A protein has these predicted regions:
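Acidic, polar ligand-binding/catalytic clefts
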Residues: 80-144, 208-209
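Extended ligand-binding regions for polar small-molecule ligands
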Residues: 31, 67-76, 154-156, 221-261
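Short helix-initiation/N-cap motifs at beta->coil->alpha
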Residues: 83-95, 137, 155, 170-184, ...
């Protein structure tokens, strides 16, 4: 998961919040006093906002599966969210620099990341799949990528998968650019999340197709620094949402199925 992890491109209006996200970065995840005298936990969240149906803008408003899940979980936990949109490659550096406190962008939970970061409990389960031009019959799956040029975004788990398959990886800013170059033959293939492929390829109209089996099942979680104290509240809310059917409802909205388990 993650296309931008990781890609290309509905609850609360966050347009104004995005505009002020950067200025509130230094206040993130710290307590501020409300008018009632209670302490408010404000979390600055980094997201790509160009990876539908997970995180994207619809008529200027931030929306998507990840955003809906986090909004609901934060409301139940009593947290206030401030969103900051940025390129995928800037998400982890922003977390390291404490500009943001949390990443909501289909971040795959991997052993390598867990060595340095903390994750919420998984809220999405998926896998990877290969994408090629619609007239490409040579590539039928991950095993055919050796020596091929594969498009991805920097820092993506899909870039790592392509490299491990022996491909030459060409990096792009986002999935739009990857698919554009793929359909005109500048790339041999791309890798992405099977849920992204399931929901977006038909909508976008790119002259590409998915090939081969889904592989490398992965789980996505909200990613934070190891010293984060907000994940416990989010995990309690996520468990409630799975139990009362809210997660299933959000999954049905975007994918026609529950992708949380």
């Amino acid at each position: 998961m993650d296309y931008q992890e990781g890609g290309i491109y509905m609850k609360k209006s966050l347009t104004a919040v995005l505009a002020f996200g950067a200025s509130f970065g230094v206040l993130a995840a710290c307590g501020s006093e409300t008018n009632s005298g209670s302490e408010e936990t404000v979390i600055t969240v980094g997201t790509e906002a160009t990876y539908p149906p997970f995180t994207y803008k619809d008529k200027g408003e931030l929306t998507g599966y990840d955003i809906d899940v986090l909004n609901e979980a934060a409301e139940r936990a009593g947290y206030t969210l401030e969103f900051e949109a940025m390129d995928f490659k800037g998400l982890v550096p922003a977390l390291d620099a404490e500009r943001i406190d949390l990443i909501a962008n289909q971040m795959s939970i991997t052993p390598e990341r867990q060595e340095k970061y903390s994750f919420s409990d998984p809220y999405a389960i998926s896998g990877a799949q290969v994408i090629v031009g619609s007239d490409n019959e040579d590539i039928q799956g991950i095993d055919d990528l050796e020596g091929k040029v594969v498009g991805s975004t920097q820092g993506s788990v899909y870039a790592q998968m392509a490299e491990e398959a022996g491909a030459e990886v060409k990096f792009y800013k986002g999935a739009n650019q990857v698919l554009q170059d793929l359909q005109v033959g500048r790339l041999d293939a791309a890798l992405n999340d099977r849920l992204f492929i399931l929901t977006e390829l038909e909508k976008t109209g790119y002259d590409v197709k998915a090939v081969g089996d889904v592989f490398n099942q992965s789980q996505a979680g909200f990613m934070a620094r190891q010293d984060s104290d907000v994940l416990e509240g989010l995990n309690e809310a996520l468990a409630e949402m799975k139990e009362d059917g809210t997660m299933e409802e959000i999954g049905e909205k975007y994918f026609g199925e529950d992708i949380s388990q």
